[in-house]
Amino acid sequence: MAPKKKRGPSAGSQPGGAAAAGAEQPLSERAQYLQREHALLSEQLDTCEESVDQVLRENAFLDREALRLREENRLYASYVSARAQRCAKAIVRLDEQNRVDLAQIHWQRAELASLYHGREDGVRAQLLEMEARAAQMAQQVQELQPYKVLQLEQLARIRALERELLHMRVEHTQLLHRVKRRFLEDKAAFEREARQRVQSLARRAEREAVRALVAHTQAIKADNGRLRQELLLLLRRTQLLHHTRRQLLEQREQLHREHEDTRDLARVHGWLRRGPGGPPLWERPAFSQPTSRPGSLAAPISPSRAASQTPSVVPSRAAPRASSVVPSREASRVPSLVLSSMDSRVPSLATSKVGSRMPSLTASRAGSRALSLVQSLEGSGISSGSSPRVSSQDTLRSTKSGPKLLSGLSRDRDPALLPPQSEDSVNAEAAAEASPGRA
């Protein structure tokens, strides 16, 4: 049968073999259509299979639910039967419990009735007692009726006193206000008076301050004028001292030259007087120098060296002496001492040991002291209007220092009184005395 079927289509297709090429295009469209149909049917088949599977799953779920419901029905039936049995037993138990509770309630009621009967008796006794006390109080009130009238009178008196107290308080408040107003007025008046007094005192103080300032200014001006005059006087004295010092230095140089000339002449006369058969020439010792003759120490020193050393010492000693003596002892020297010092020192210094270092120092000291004494003499003439007490004290001080000055003058005047010294000791002493002058 199958081969026949296959042969049938092949036989039917044989007559159309010639037109197979022309019908190839429509066959492809049909195949496409069939393919689309096949795909659609496949999808529908898959959908049906899925629905079948879902129905099977739902059927299995329903079977399980049916089994669960049957089990629950069985359990519920057993529970209902057990509950019915429990309810029957519970009814029996509740009836017994209610009977027991009722018996207990009756017993408690009897106890409470007996208790409240006793309390009722006590309260009734208290009520009777309170009624008796109320009757007694009413009787006492009737007895105190006159006191009530007195109380009313006292209350009326208290009200009157309260009104009077209120009136007194008002009056007291008004009085306090008046006193306070008067106090404030007095306070303002006193403050004005005090302010006026303070202002007057301030004006007076300002006037006094201005007057004191003017007086102080005038005093300062007077002091400045006096100090200016003193300064001018001191400047003039300083100029005079410098002029005197220059004159003394010139005299000293002149005396030094004269002394050198005299010594040269004496040496020449000695050579002429000695002759060829005279005594041998004098030679300086090796370790010491004689100090008997004044010219022996000054012979080796040249005039230029003596002149260069002497001015260096004289200003250093004369300047501090003059500056220290002038302001402190302006009116303290006596004219007699000044004249004696001037007469005794200056000539002796001009003729003693001009060429040596020690005489130059003594000469500078003597010159500075002489200048200070001259200045003190001038100061004494200028400040003659000072007080007697100051002049007497300065006179005593000058008289006390007189012997020292005279001894110094005599020592400077007599060269033989000087101790013997070597040239090195003289140089050291000159340097030691020159150092304070530089300081």
UniProtKB/Swiss-Prot annotation:
Keywords for the protein's UniProt record, in alphabetical order: Coiled coil
Compositional bias (Low complexity): 9-23, 376-392, 428-439
Compositionally biased intervals (Polar residues): 338-365
Pfam families, A to Z: DUF4515
Region (Disordered): 1-28, 276-439
Residue ranges that the Swiss-Prot or TrEMBL entry lists as coiled coil: 27-74, 121-213
Keyword Coiled coil attributed: yes
Top-level division of the source organism's lineage: Eukaryota
Protein name per Swiss-Prot or TrEMBL: Coiled-coil domain-containing protein 166
UniProt source species: Homo sapiens (Human)
The organism's taxonomic lineage, starting at the top: Eukaryota, Metazoa, Chordata, Craniata, Vertebrata
